[in-house]
């Protein structure tokens, strides 16, 4: 009702149209109370639907962004069982059909934040395309998929983690999924640009939520230092406690 899931989405698509500064302030406040909610909101807007916002055409934005403001959570499918920080080393593959109307998508994605809840996935996959010299090369393309597509299998939903258990990570298999050509984001072979641009936004905004959690922890430590007495004096009177609080304050700043 408050529009938090559509904070950065333009107003013409039903969002609030917030800039980055306003957005990170909200995330910082959310992070003070619930890390899981901060991750859910940030993953949805910073890397999930951000690809559609930045690289979608007018038709794609009009089709998907209103749903992403209201009843859809989005997921970013980049990491794979054998592919982590090497974003260009995708083993998931897509191949165009002979009539050029679909991409046939095959592969597996891992650690997709909110993937078990999402109505829209941005999926990175290697595709054979012709290079500038006319030779065939493999490049990453970005495709939009939905969980109801035939061949999409969300076969593992994980909340058994050390923390942030309010988010559902997922492992997703794509088995001969027919993705319409209209679901291609940006251009063929430009998916790595899509992925890295979205990750840059995520680094900025997710860190705001973590800052909120750190600030909250510092506030609690200060409160405890003032109210907890040992040796007939509050803990805040001891030099070691003051040094620790000062260090926490410096890190938060």
Question: For the regions a protein language model found, what residue spans apply to each?
Answer:
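Buried hydrophobic positions in well-ordered alpha/beta secondary-structure cores of metabolic enzymes
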Residues: 3, 10, 26, 57, ...
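A structural signal for short hydrophobic beta-strand segments in well-ordered beta-sheet cores
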Residues: 92-96
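A short core secondary-structure module
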Residues: 101-102, 106-155
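Glycine-rich beta->alpha junctions and the first turn(s) of the following alpha-helix
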Residues: 154-253
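Short Ser/Thr-interspersed hydrophobic loop/turn segments at strand-loop and sheet-helix junctions
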Residues: 27-31, 125, 145-150, 176-179
């Amino acid at each position: 009702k408050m529009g938090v899931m559509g904070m950065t989405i333009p107003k013409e698509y039903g969002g609030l149209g917030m800039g980055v500064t306003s957005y990170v302030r909200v995330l910082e406040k959310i992070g003070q109370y619930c890390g899981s909610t901060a991750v859910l909101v940030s993953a949805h807007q910073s890397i999930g639907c951000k690809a559609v916002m930045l690289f979608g055409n007018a038709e794609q934005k009009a089709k998907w962004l209103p749903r992403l403001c209201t009843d859809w959570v989005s997921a970013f499918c980049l990491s794979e069982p054998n592919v982590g920080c090497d974003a260009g080393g995708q083993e998931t593959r897509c191949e165009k059909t002979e009539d050029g109307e679909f991409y046939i998508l095959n592969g597996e994605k891992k650690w997709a934040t909110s993937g078990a809840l999402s109505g829209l996935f941005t999926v990175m996959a290697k595709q054979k395309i012709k290079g500038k010299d006319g030779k065939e090369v493999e490049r990453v393309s970005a495709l939009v998929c939905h969980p109801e597509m035939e061949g999409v299998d969300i076969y593992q939903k994980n909340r058994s983690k050390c923390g942030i258990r309010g988010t559902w990570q997922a492992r997703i298999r794509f088995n001969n999924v027919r993705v319409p050509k209209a679901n291609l984001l940006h251009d063929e072979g430009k998916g790595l640009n899509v992925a890295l641009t979205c990750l840059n936004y995520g680094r900025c905004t997710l860190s705001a939520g973590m800052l909120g959690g750190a600030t909250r922890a510092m506030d609690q430590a200060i409160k405890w230092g003032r109210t907890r007495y040992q040796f007939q004096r509050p803990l805040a009177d001891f030099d070691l406690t003051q040094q620790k609080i000062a260090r926490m304050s410096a890190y938060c700043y």
